[in-house]
Amino acid sequence: MSDTNNHSKNIIHRILTEQINLTSNELDTKSTKEIVNIFSEADKEPQKAVERVIPELINAIDEITSRLKSNGRLFYIGTGTSGRLGVLDASECPPTFCTNPDLVQGIIAGGISSLTTSSEHLEDVSEIAISDLKDRNFSYRDVLIGITASGRTPYVLGALNYSKSISALTISISSVPERDSTLDNDIDIRLITGPEILAGSTRLKAGTATKMALNIISTSVMIKLGKVYGNRMIDLSVSNDKLLDRAIGILFDIGSVDKVTAVQLLKKTNGSVKLSLLIALSGMDVIDAKQLLNDSKGNLRTALIRVKGN
């Protein structure tokens, strides 16, 4: 056997996220300024990666919205950084959009304790993911977004395969090309950010791109569900002084009411900015405004169009 053949047999194939980033080679010899500049330049890649998958994001948003309007729920599932990003995005939905905590849920291998401690040994156990979904009564009505930078994590792939088997909507988010991981879901979003500054540390560029994609997906879905008017969070949960000030500001800007009136409206509506706005803009009483909102499926703009039509 030739030396060439011997050499080729010893070559290790590394998936994209495990490859060496030549621009950050000898990183430990760099000055602080050089390190920061390397990071700054590398962090342009996540934005480019997101721009390349805009069609897939649009498809995902529309399909998720359709499922949620039909009493479905949205689940994120992942391990390590990927799991933490899913839990983070899900946990922001109730305070930002006043959603029921059951509507958008994040599942991380190992449960809540894995948010602060490593549970990497669970990444390779696909059966646990299936059990985690069954514990939440996951059904064909629901949506599963499996987050796996490598596109290979057994825990995530097991969850996606189970979801497909019961006809739930399945979406994957990975950071590798098809040659590194063959995924076959309803929608596969590949955020190609290239080798990491620290080889294999996908909490960096891959994680940043994933966070950007999740921001776009969840926020866009909530807009489609009527949780936003203009660019204002009209379904926010008024749970502290900062959010109370924000709610008053929204009523002042859109409803053209002063601070005293805004506070009175929020008291009447148990802190509902959306309902308070409808009352301020239409002159309706609480009961009639609430009924109109229900008839308009919670969409303030639709409700206001109906008021003008009458």
Curated annotation (Swiss-Prot):
Keyword Signal tagged: no
Catalysis: reaction(s): N-acetyl-D-muramate 6-phosphate + H2O = N-acetyl-D-glucosamine 6-phosphate + (R)-lactate
Keywords: Carbohydrate metabolism, Lyase
GO molecular function: carbohydrate derivative binding; carbon-oxygen lyase activity; ether hydrolase activity
Pathway named in the protein's UniProt entry: Amino-sugar metabolism; N-acetylmuramate degradation
Entry similarity comment: Belongs to the GCKR-like family. MurNAc-6-P etherase subfamily.
Protein name, as recorded: N-acetylmuramic acid 6-phosphate etherase
Species annotation: Prochlorococcus marinus (strain NATL2A)
Gene assigned in the entry: murQ
